[in-house]
Amino acid sequence: MPEQKRWSKLTRWTAAGMLSFSILLGNVFPVHAETTAPAAPQISEWSVKTLNEGEKYGIYPINWYYDGSFQKSITPDKFKTLMEGTETKLDKLGFNKKVASLSFPTDKVITRETVITSLHKLLANYELPKAFDMTADMAPIDYMQNKGLVKGTKAGLELDKPSTVEHAAVMASRLVEFAYDAAGAGAEGLMWKVTNKQNTLYLLGSVHLGLTDMYPMQKSIREAFDASDNLWVELDMLNGDMSYFNEKMQYSDGTTIKDHVSKETYEKLQKALTKLDLQGNAFDGFKPFAISTSLSTLGYAQNPEAYQMAMLTGIDNYFITKAMLTGKPIHELEGIKLQADLFANVPPAQQEKELNTMLDSILNEKGMEESAEYLKKMQLDWIEGDAEGLAKLLEVGFEDEASKRLIGERDKNMALKLAKLLEKEGENTSFVVVGAAHYVTKGMVVDLLKEKGYTVQYLQ
């Protein structure tokens, strides 16, 4: 198989929504030799909505949630890490700095006032446009309160109290979102607005494995979500019933993958697992399609931590979590059963053939590197709102059988369901997140809705 076509296939799996499988697989069994179940995160109810945003920015390590100190006083070392991460994120706005390098307090006790004034100092060091309304005559805490970054009255802020790691992370997260919104910055995303009478659909194309540069998103995307009555996704990965999926992806007769594929394929699988630093028996009880979909994602990440962050910043996961936190109803366009059947019903010989394609990609000397590059290109197209660029990236090799399962009949069914939403009585607004390939590919969901006579507008 030509190299370009092989890497394109990996990318299409990501764009077409099938990586939800591997995200689910990661919750079913430990694929990495050293993987252990994490402790419950230490996050307060008051902070969780803000941290659902801030954790995607890459300004602090996610393991802070689990190390037992998140709700304790922040140490000078962690404060330094947070300030450096926040500065790196703000640097990406492209503003010139007044001073090349700033110093921040290293006192043993970092107070709430220290955190707030330090974050203000960091922001004030940039040559900001008028939209920030930053003037020399407004005190740092007054400015931060005025912009909604600090909640409550000055008397109730307990400024002399030691700041917890959680409090500092929330303050930094709010600052980043404010700065990006004031600058009119943020990831552009791929979003269409479809209207009929009083009904509106916001169609957001998803990349199922993300990166921190995809956050914060443009304020207009977040506002469209906030204005919507409900969220529609391919399948609800966080709340769906996994039992049917578990049944379909595993052998139930006591046999293993070794009993169902050729000796050559099994040996190739063992070599791939060794290269990925996975246990040799990690997938013994699973069918070829389950192994393919899981391995297709592992090739994108250099280590388990990067893989975890890629899943965390996936667009689907972000909006499903956001809907849960805000009480917004979540509906499925397809569901676990449909996607499980889509793969499980493929003839065993074809499953093995596609598994071999995946294994060849992993074992190729540059395979994982090129696979990661393709994903990065797709993510950058999403960040820049380049629907045409993404469509060109995905168009290679759409003729094969696997691609036809991913794109085609599924899109027709999605378009029919979306049309029903547009024909509902009264005024209704829905936010619809599915794999970007379903939207950017010619003749699929967006074009099908246009053909039905609905008004479709690409938002940039």
What are these regions (language model features)?
Residues 1-14:
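Bacterial Sec-dependent N-terminal signal peptides
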Residues 196-402:
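Structured, acidic catalytic/metal-binding patches in enzyme active sites
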Residues 400-460:
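A cross-kingdom marker for long, charged
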Residues 182-200:
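N- or domain-start disorder-to-order transition segments that initiate the globular core
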